[in-house]
Amino acid sequence: MTSISVIKKDITSLTVDAIVNAANSGLRGGGGVDGAIHAGAGPGLMNECAAIIEKNGLCATGSAVTTSAGDLPAKWIIHTVGPIWGEEGEERSSLLLSSCYKSALDAASNLRADSVAFSAISTGVYGFPKKLAAPIAVSAVCSWLEAHQRAEAPSSIFLVCFDEENFRITKAVLDRLGPNNTPWVRTEGQ
């Protein structure tokens, strides 16, 4: 059975099968978590990302692609491009954000990743309101789990929050669900 946990950590320090990067469409590395992941993974990551872009073009918002994790303790990085708040309407942005989580879980399933750690997609420089993003993230993960066989699903999913505000908001969403409403939820402290 899969567990969903919220933790407050630096995603680049986690020893998991896959970490999910909040990437830009060119996979170039940027600010926030994207920049930290690129810096931690080393120069080989930029070469892998450039090869993906050369072959497939820019990554669409809501899609996901996979690379090795380079020098990070994870095995893989799943790069997903979140919506930039204000570029689309709220409904479309919410659907795209949900698609990020589902696409990343599809990629994790294809990798047979047993543990996956998500950054809080689009809540940094892309400006998606944290109070809207957290319920979308949790809902997307839960609906993906409901639609897939246990053999396809990771056994551990971590919603990783770098800042206290995201941690509190996401923990509150998971606490409201609780184990009585979904078999997957387990919240953790810092």
Please identify what each model-predicted range represents.
Residues W85-Q190:
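Phosphate/ribose-phosphate-bearing ligand recognition and processing surfaces
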Residues M1-N110:
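Glycine-/small-residue-enriched capping loops at alpha/beta junctions
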